[in-house]
């Protein structure tokens, strides 16, 4: 499980609302992207075009997507909810 994100300084460095890129690394399975998008639609509804790249051995994949965020707390919430998915290993 990924460590919870809290007490960040996003509010000091970004003007909201703004697009924010998230990169999620997890175990390669057919449901990872769907699980991520399902959670993200609840927190930040929108149309997403995730970019998925498999690892060289095919055991992992990275999912990159851009979401419109409204505050630093919104970014933290997205990090915390998605990082709690069972197959997620790292999130940037």
From Swiss-Prot:
SUPFAM superfamilies: YbeD/HP0495-like. InterPro entries: UPF0250_YbeD-like, YbeD-like_sf. Gene3D superfamilies: 3.30.70.260. GO terms for cellular component: cytosol. Belongs to the UPF0250 family. HAMAP family: UPF0250. This is UPF0250 protein PSHAa1021.
């Amino acid at each position: 499980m990924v460590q919870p994100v809290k007490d960040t300084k996003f509010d000091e460095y970004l003007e909201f609302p703004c697009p924010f890129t998230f990169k999620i690394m997890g175990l390669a399975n057919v449901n990872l992207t769907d699980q991520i998008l399902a959670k993200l639609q609840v927190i930040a509804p929108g149309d997403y075009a995730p970019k998925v790249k498999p690892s060289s051995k095919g055991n992992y994949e990275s999912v990159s997507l851009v979401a419109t965020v409204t505050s630093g707390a919104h970014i933290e919430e997205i990090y915390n909810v998605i990082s709690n998915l069972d197959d997620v290993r790292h999130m940037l």
